[in-house]
């Protein structure tokens, strides 16, 4: 095997697979190095993809020809649209996965990717060139692998430690060794490291669960795919089930809190605020006597069940005792105990918008190493890091950065939040984090991003053709609709009351009426039934929310004006006397690329922004004057 590559990606999880595939799609000769090839694409925790805001990320990854959407469509065994009864901005696709089928799909997609090689290697160190750039990696056997750029996607493996009661085990995932050398290397290079914690629930034997006594939770029919390339889901579908904890469950937990590593002081890392362990729920929400649990089968031919909602690191005997108090699980057998895992992460404020590090050019970080939680957040970062690693490896500093701003997608919101605000707890994406969420819907991710992907060169021929077909279908549908305009008397004869103002109205004009939807339009104009469902959805949303969308486009224009005001990379914030010491410190740490990014730093005031803008303009003026003296 060659020891020189354009891009080397370390780690075969969700961030690593997207990074490697993205780099290869841009033509980079890419190596994906991971401990075990059989674990590539493994779902370490919950067997599901998507959800609120997370589903938006998956659709955006797919719009740029990424892996995750296609893989879950092949391996998904239950598909749902969450928040279907709410507005389109907050609807999120989610799919339950067959773990084995999902991992197989990921590996198959990677195997079909030209220019990508996978190798079982334990990477222990980084290679630094004489020019101070990251020049490759060194494996556990001392082998040197050179590259133009390196992407670290180490997940929970950086100095990972598993906790089950008082028992601690160094591991990156249960049964797998941690990455100790890389953590030491990052510390030696001066990267600011922190410690985070996440957890997983016990796995249950589904054959010992009393399913008949539980509430069933079926998926949507027909199953809504993730990928814009998928026409239909062909994998057999299953139902999940719902149960809940009881007062007795909470008593068992409270009586054993002294044995919980989370409360004994054994765990120092900060856990995810929005995905707490069951012991944390019982303490934080002491007034509640029950918490919902979703019983999620892990595969069509696998009896393992994932009880979503009872992540725990309590001792095994306590886990068994609390399971026996839950309806339907009284006789359930535990196949594997739940556990917590602590791991190192890097403060993401030392990254730029391409996810390249400021301390070591040529090194990119993606996934949980940047303080995030969730498969989808990791995959999104992997995509961005992989694309930029390929550009840097091919063109060096001349490479135009590949970035996404907050008005382009959740991809941009995610990266901007991380590099501007940093995080002290595992970061999770929510629709509430996106200011322009009505524009950044899951349903229009391809219309927002695929053209950009085509221009960048990361979108293949099949997706390009599908995208052009959809755009042509939208144009044809609008032309047809414009020819269906009717006068108020004509509409009245069809049972639709409008102002008798003499103005002709198209079918889309009528969607501002709360009682009129697309189905009613088709009943009135049968020819509309020939329009593709995905195209009809775009037309309906665009018409129904036209006023809101127009105002939001105005907001985006104002946002882009601020983003266009670039702050010099070498700006010495310590010398800005008009700013408080606190703000000078925050600006020095975050080093925002634009005035807009500076405005999003906590504590930044309008007065401080004005002072910053004046300083930059004065500096530019002085620089121009020097050129003529």
Curated annotation (Swiss-Prot):
GO cellular component terms given for this protein: cytosol
GO biological process, one term: tRNA wobble uridine modification
Matching SUPFAM superfamilies: FAD/NAD(P)-binding domain (SSF51905)
Alphabetized InterPro entries for the sequence: FAD/NAD-bd_sf, GIDA_C_N, MnmG, MnmG-rel, MnmG-rel_CS, MnmG_C, MnmG_C_subdom, MnmG_C_subdom_sf
Essential cofactor(s): FAD
Keyword set, alphabetical order: Cytoplasm, FAD, Flavoprotein, NAD, tRNA processing
Annotated binding of FAD, by residue: 11-16
Positions of NAD(+) binding: 271-285
Intracellular or extracellular location(s): Cytoplasm
Listed PROSITE patterns: GIDA_1, GIDA_2
UniProt GO MF annotations: flavin adenine dinucleotide binding
Complex and partners: Homodimer. Heterotetramer of two MnmE and two MnmG subunits.
Similarity-based family: Belongs to the MnmG family.
Reported function: NAD-binding protein involved in the addition of a carboxymethylaminomethyl (cmnm) group at the wobble position (U34) of certain tRNAs, forming tRNA-cmnm(5)s(2)U34.
Name recorded for this polypeptide: tRNA uridine 5-carboxymethylaminomethyl modification enzyme MnmG
Gene this protein is translated from: mnmG
């Amino acid at each position: 095997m060659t020891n020189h590559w354009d891009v080397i990606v370390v780690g075969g999880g969700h961030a690593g697979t997207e990074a490697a595939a993205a780099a290869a799609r841009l033509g980079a000769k890419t190596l994906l190095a991971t401990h075990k090839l059989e674990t590539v694409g493994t779902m370490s925790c919950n067997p599901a993809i998507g959800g609120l805001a997370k589903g938006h990320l998956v659709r955006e990854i797919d719009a740029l020809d990424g892996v995750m959407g296609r893989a879950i469509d092949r391996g998904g065994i239950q598909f749902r649209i969450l928040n279907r009864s709410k507005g389109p901005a907050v609807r999120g696709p989610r799919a339950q996965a067959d773990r084995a089928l999902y991992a197989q799909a990921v590996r198959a997609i990677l195997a079909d990717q030209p220019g990508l090689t996978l190798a079982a290697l334990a990477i222990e160190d980084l290679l630094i060139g004489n020019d101070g750039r990251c020049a490759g990696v060194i494996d556990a056997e001392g082998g040197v692998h050179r590259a133009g750029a390196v992407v670290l996607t180490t997940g929970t493996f950086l100095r990972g430690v598993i906790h089950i009661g008082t028992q601690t085990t160094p591991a990156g995932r249960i049964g797998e060794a941690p990455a100790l050398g890389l953590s030491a290397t990052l510390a030696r290079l001066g990267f600011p490291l922190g410690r985070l914690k996440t957890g997983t629930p016990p796995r249950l034997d589904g054959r010992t669960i009393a399913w008949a006594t539980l509430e069933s939770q079926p998926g949507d029919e027909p199953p809504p795919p993730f990928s814009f390339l998928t026409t239909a889901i062909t994998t057999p579908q299953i139902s999940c089930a719902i149960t809940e904890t009881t007062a007795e469950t909470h008593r068992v937990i409270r009586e054993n809190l002294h044995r919980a590593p989370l409360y004994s002081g054994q765990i120092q890392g900060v856990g995810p605020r929005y995905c707490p362990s069951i012991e944390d729920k019982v303490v934080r929400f002491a007034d509640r006597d029950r918490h919902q649990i979703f019983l999620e089968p892990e595969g069509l031919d696998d009896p393992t069940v994932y009880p979503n909602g009872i992540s725990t690191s309590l001792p095994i005997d306590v886990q068994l005792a609390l399971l026996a108090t839950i309806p339907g699980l009284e006789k359930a057998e535990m196949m594997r105990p739940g556990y917590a895992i602590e791991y190192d992460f890097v403060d993401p404020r030392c990254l730029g918008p391409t996810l390249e590090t400021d301390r070591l050019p040529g090194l990119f970080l993606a996934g949980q190493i940047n303080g995030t939680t969730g498969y989808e957040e990791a995959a999104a970062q992997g995509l961005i890091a992989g694309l930029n690693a390929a550009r840097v490896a091919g063109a060096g500093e001349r490479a135009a950065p590949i970035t996404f701003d907050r008005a382009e997608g959740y991809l941009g919101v995610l990266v901007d939040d991380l590099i501007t605000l940093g995080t002290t707890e595992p970061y999770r994406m929510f629709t509430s984090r996106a200011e322009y969420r009505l524009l950044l819907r899951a349903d229009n991710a391809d219309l927002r991003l695929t053209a950009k992907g085509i221009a960048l060169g990361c979108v293949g021929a099949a997706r390009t053709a599908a995208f052009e077909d959809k755009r042509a279908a939208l144009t044809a549908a609008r032309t047809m609709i414009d020819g269906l305009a009717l006068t108020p008397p004509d509409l009245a004869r069809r049972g639709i009351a409008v102002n008798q103002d003499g103005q002709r109205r198209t079918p889309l004009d009528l969607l501002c009426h709360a009682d009129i939807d697309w189905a009613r339009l088709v009943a009135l104009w049968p020819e509309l039934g020939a329009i593709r469902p995905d195209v009809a959805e775009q037309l309906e949303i665009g018409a129904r929310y036209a006023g809101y969308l127009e105002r939001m486009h105005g907001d985006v224009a104002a946002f882009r004006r601020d983003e266009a005001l670039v702050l010099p990379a070498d700006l010495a914030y310590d010398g800005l006397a008009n700013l408080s010491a606190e703000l000078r410190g925050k600006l020095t740490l975050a080093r925002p690329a634009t005035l807009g990014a500076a405005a999003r730093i906590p504590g930044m005031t309008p007065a401080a922004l004005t002072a910053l803008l004046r300083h930059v303009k004065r500096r530019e003026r002085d620089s121009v004057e020097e050129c003529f003296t």
